[in-house]
């Protein structure tokens, strides 16, 4: 929702929750009751915007915070069995798979373990900032995305049957200036 606090100041907020659970799975019956992968239990966002005309110019500043709860990236979670058949026959892959150490570095404490037992990535929050000054035909904007350079995992595609995972780190801090001309 939104709340117009004053003529120039607005607060926006949002919250969503998903209570997803795996009912049944033929190839891995032991995962029934686990969380649906790739779906955090909740997300939330908060933004404060100050938008003020100063003479013929418009000055706008906006700070945003977005939070994502813990998320599992595989149907196998916690102390579930590591594989339905004790490994992949003929490939010499043992039942206990190794998750790349890079996942620990990206998530810090409590992120993905070096064991296939834990396929959860910790919650994280990102702060963005924008400040714009504009006239009738132009706008100059300075911005910072992921202002505090939060390290987080953006996506994990688990492939334990093949000995690991494909990991995409979250977006690092980026900052810049944009110029817009309307003609």
Predicted segments — roles?
Residues 66-88, 132-183:
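C-terminal beta-signal and adjacent terminal beta-strands/loops
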Residues 39-134:
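C-terminal beta-barrel architecture of Gram-negative outer-membrane proteins
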Residues 22-30, 105-112, 154-159:
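Flexible, solvent-exposed coil segments and beta strand-coil junctions
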Residues 8, 12, 21, 25, ...:
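Surface-exposed loop/turn and secondary-structure junction residues enriched for glycine/proline
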Residues 1-76, 178-182:
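Gram-negative outer-membrane beta-barrel transporters
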Residues 19, 33, 51, 121-123, ...:
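Generic secondary-structure boundary/loop-capping signal
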Residues 27-36, 114-118, 162-167:
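Extracellular loop and loop/strand-boundary signature of outer-membrane beta-barrel proteins
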